[in-house]
């Protein structure tokens, strides 16, 4: 890694960092902080540029990261603290930021690994919730994650931080049409299971998109088979279009008076029930 010293906010590389941070170059991601950049190195993503300050070299962890970066073929820049503050997305920068290639997967990549357990995020709007769901999906042994159209970007700064780097490791197919996802899942015999708000009687039927389906308690469902678990947006749940395509609907029992769970919390409960049924047999991706 060749390193240049930069003290001006008008430097072209500094401007490029700011453009990428603002989302102007979709094929690149802006990463900030020691942990995310360590995760990116471990995940094997391609680095375009790395920027750091003297503060990074003041800690043992920072020195270890610098040592790892010596073997990364990319452009390096030693910034003044003032210039780092100009490109940083956080109030208290840790002294390191990077531009890396955005991971790129399609739905076939996500569904290729067997036995399949895939998460589908349907129109989630909160980046923190999506990032936490990605992190939980990886921890519970999911093969990958799919987002439907109108879902927040899983690689946005807040999503990436909430995922604790999982979004750089877990295959994610982004922004797909619900019907395309359903057709490909059915073609591969992957059952679509959508989380739902519970009806008054957990075994009663509900009408959804002109179809009558049973809503079962999540512990009654067989998660050992190939499944795609669908979680909907925070306020309204799984969209009607997506729930109408689901093979089964499930819910989490709750005490009276409780309207709903946070989608990340609901995801953790259901994903770990699936992992339990699968004997916590986590396959290495």
Q: Each PLM stretch: what is its role?
A:
Residues 6, 29, 122-123, 148-149, ...:
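Glycine- and other small-residue-rich loops at beta-strand/loop junctions that grip anionic moieties
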Residues 193-258:
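Active-site/ligand-binding-proximal alpha/beta "capping" segment
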Residues 60-72, 242:
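Short, aromatic/basic amphipathic alpha-helical patches
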Residues 98, 139-140, 154, 159-166, ...:
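Structured adenosyl-cofactor binding patch, chiefly the S-adenosyl-L-methionine
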């Amino acid at each position: 890694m060749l390193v240049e010293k930069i003290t001006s906010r008008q430097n072209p590389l500094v401007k490029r960092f700011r453009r990428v941070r603002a989302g102007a170059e979709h094929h690149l991601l802006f990463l900030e902080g020691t942990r995310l950049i360590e995760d990116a190195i471990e995940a094997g993503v391609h680095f375009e540029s790395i920027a750091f300050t003297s503060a990074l070299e003041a800690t043992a962890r920072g020195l270890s990261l610098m040592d790892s970066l010596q073997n990364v073929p990319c452009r390096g820049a030693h910034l003044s603290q003032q210039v780092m503050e100009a490109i940083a997305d956080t109030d208290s920068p840790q002294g390191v930021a990077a531009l890396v290639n955005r991971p790129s997967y399609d739905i076939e990549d996500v569904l290729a690994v067997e036995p399949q357990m895939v998460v589908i995020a349907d129109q989630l709007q909160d980046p923190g919730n999506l990032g936490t769901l990605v992190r939980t999906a990886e921890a519970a042994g999911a093969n990958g994650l799919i987002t439907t159209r109108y879902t927040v970007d899983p690689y946005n700064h807040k999503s990436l931080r909430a995922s604790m780097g999982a979004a750089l490791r877990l295959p994610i197919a982004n922004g797909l049409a619900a019907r395309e996802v359903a057709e490909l899942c059915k073609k591969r015999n992957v059952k679509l299971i959508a989380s739902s708000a519970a009806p008054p009687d957990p075994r009663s039927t509900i009408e959804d998109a002109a179809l009558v389906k049973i809503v079962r308690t999540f512990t009654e469902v067989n998660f050992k088979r190939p499944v795609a678990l669908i979680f909907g947006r925070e306020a309204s749940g799984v969209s009607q279009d997506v729930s109408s395509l689901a093979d089964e609907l499930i819910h989490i029992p709750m005490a009276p008076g409780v309207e709903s769970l946070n989608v990340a919390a609901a995801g953790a409960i259901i994903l770990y029930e699936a992992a339990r049924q699968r004997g916590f047999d986590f396959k290495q991706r």
